[in-house]
Amino acid sequence: MIYDIKDFLKKFFSSRLFVLAAVIIFMFALLAERVFTLQIIKGADYQKNFIMLIKKPLSIEASRGNIYDVNGELLAYNQLAYSVVISDNGSYSSTKEHNRLLNKELNEIINVIKNNGGSIYNDFPVVLNDDGTYSFTFTSETSKKRFLSDVFGKKYDKLEYNKALGFDEANASAQNIIDFLSSDQNECFDISSKYDTQATYDIVVMRYAIKQNRFTKYKTTTIAKDVNDSIVAYVNEHSDTLTGISIEEDTIRKYNYPEYISSLIGYTGKISTDEYNELSKDDDSYTQNDMVGKSGLEQYYESYLRGKNGEKQVYVNNVGKINEVISQKNPVSGNDVYLSIDIKLQEATYKLLEQEIAGIVYSKIKSGEIPISDVYFALINNNVVDLTHFNASDASATEQAIYNSFSGQLQDALSTIDSELESGTSGTASMSEQTLDYFTCVMSVLNDDGLLLSKQIDTSDSTYASWKAGTLSPRDYLKYCISKQWIDITKLDVDQKYADSSEIYTALCSYIKDAMTDNKDFAKIIYKYMVNSGAVTGQQLCLLLFDQGVLDYDDATVSNIANGSISPYAFLMDKINNIEITPAQLALDPCTGSCVITDVKTGQLKALVSYPGYDNNKLANTVDADYYQSLREDKSNPLWNYATQEQTAPGSTFKMVSSTAGLAEGVIDTSSKINCTGIFTEISNQPKCWIYPGAHGMDNVSEALRDSCNVFFYTTGFRLASKDTGSYDDENGMKYIQKYASIYGLDQKSGVEIVEKTPSIATQYPVMAAIGQSNNNFTTISLSRYVTAVASGKLYDYKLMNKIVDADGKTVKQYDSKSTDISGTLTQSQWDAIHQGMRMVVEDLHDVFGGFTGVEVSGKTGTAQQVETRPNHALFVGYAPSSDPEITIATRISSGYSSHNAAAASRNIISYYYNLESLDNLLAVKAEGVNASGSSAITD
């Protein structure tokens, strides 16, 4: 046995197998030693180094501060919400598979979100319009250039004509962008043609957002915010099949009283690149995912409201998933901002102003000054009814009938255009109104689309002059434009090298026909004539209001309209009377207004109203693209702040400035009498008083303010212009008017913390400037500041902020009343004369303030003409109580016909403020109870 073993070992050690075994054992020993060194001896060091490579910081956004009114009523706050998010960290065998599966998954979750009443988070700068076209939403050229650079992956100055794509990258249209990103080009999204237009757009929006996080895949991309329980449940239940999609807790910005306060507060949204670059200069804690104030006080007080972001350190694996949170620094909440605004007064002022405007519209329809056909068409023209739904698969019978009729009219209109372009020889001046409207739209589209190179047109050219004079046909003009190279042929389907002028013109005609076929403005022109001819009836339009959900469906009313028991006229008048259809929706004159109420003792703003308003909840957090587009297309322009941005002549409200100038410079005194004969004959154009052919007779300054006597103030302006030299000098007169208007602050902004236009004092014609005409141009808030100075002798710097309080309740900033004392401009007796005149104005307004007791009011009316084709603007400025003013009010109703209408709205607002009547009682009279007055003629 032993010998056998020895023999075996002898043979083994002497064999080649031994050498092989020895080598294997040696190598295994080396491997064991290496593993021991890596894991035991140096394991901690390698682990540490590995962790440092994948340790990532994540910002925790601070809770934004709240906004309150002066009484602590909550206006803006944060609400806990759930968001659907995605991390693009799936594993795919190829780029093609990645695109296909990710697009499919996004389409699935987007459909779930939409089918359950949600909407996708969309800050993509291209919107899909109702008519299926795309447009950009940029607010600056810089933003657009940066976007194009990002899309095409190169610096903007390197963008050029791309032969493969067929367009110039630097001038890419919104449609070009969607087509490019949807394609299978390098780093594009390869979206299948099986997806319809809306689905393709939604996928592009999401894929582009995901692309922004391509270098930080551990960060999530938001698909939808503030989703409901049904969507949350779906995502959680399908988490095993929805790759990278999950639910996250979030906060969203919410606003109370949105319609009444949106023009002041504004809204928040995701920070843009431009905003990030600007804000980061002063605060490097901003990230490109932060929510910031986009407009209004949210933007102005961003640094106070924002708070301080926290941070957490995390470990992420090689595909970007978070494995562990290793530390966290909690954020610090933002400060709360308290406004000087009383929201209840703000709301009441808005409603009473709206009722006054509705009352004017109601009375003008009733009198026939606004034809009922204009009201019918307004429902189409201002998009109250949705034209794009007329041919939808679920269109109502009424919608289908209107669309069928429209289709025939569209073909007739296109035939008219074809005929004119093919053989028309008559100038536009001899065209029918309808055909002229068609070609006005055609030329507008060519200009907007960039085909007509308007900057290259020689306006001194004789042929161009003939076109402007209406003696040239569209056919001849467009052919001439081609010959002068005023047409951009790169946008036409022609061979740019070899096409002759005839081929270019044929292509241009084809372009026009295609463009008009799908143009919304052109469709509205056709509908206007269909309404006027009865091809679309008032009955049909009234039924559409129910079919499309503009009004709550009511079987009995619908039946009565359909069978003729209720006429369209009676139905619409009832809805206007009850303000179920608002002046803003109709966008007829008048449809806008503003009012500012100020505390005379402190200069604080108690109400600053712009009508109409909008729902800033739909623009905050993520913009509701459809809603935003509807606001942009709304002819009442609700995004415009009519209190701080609209400028008009002040009309006779300016006469306190002229009184001040005349008294201070000694060209009149408190007892001076000027004889009004109804006409002023000292200058060549011989302007008339509003009372002409009547006359006011002898008036002193107080009586002239009461009567709003133009001749008195023409004379004052004339005397100021003649003061220094004894002879009339236009420039000299303007020097004095500008001096005293400036004392009242009418050459500077009020100081309010939102967008405001700078008022401008007239620069010519002192005689006309003295009655508030010439080129005087003021905002409502500048008139408020002016009348507050008249009432108090102080020119205040306005502010909307009352105080700012931190999270612990400590006041960090307090409103400090700042003013300039202007009381020394006049003697007390001169001030008294002006104040007496303003009191007499109100006492003389029997149709407005007759029977008004409880508080004495002083004021001044003003009617300002802007254009002859529209009604005059209605203005009123005043204060109360007359003997010891507490508040001032400045009201403007744009195109409001008569100043009495602005005075009536002011009366009701003052009545509410002093608790003389309840808001319910004031609103109970409805539109028909408003004593709307005035024509388009100036009456004061």
What are these regions (language model features)?
Residues T592, P687-P693, T725-V767:
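Mid-domain, small-residue-enriched loop/turn segments at the edges of structured enzyme/sensor domains
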Residues Y77-L80, D88, T670-D707, V752-P759, ...:
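Conserved active-site-proximal loop/helix segments of enzymes involved in bacterial cell-wall
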Residues N335-D336, V375, I380-T440, L446-D448, ...:
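Conserved catalytic neighborhood of penicillin-recognizing serine enzymes
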Residues I54-K56, I86-N99, K217-K225, S285-Q288, ...:
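Second-shell loop/turn segments in exported
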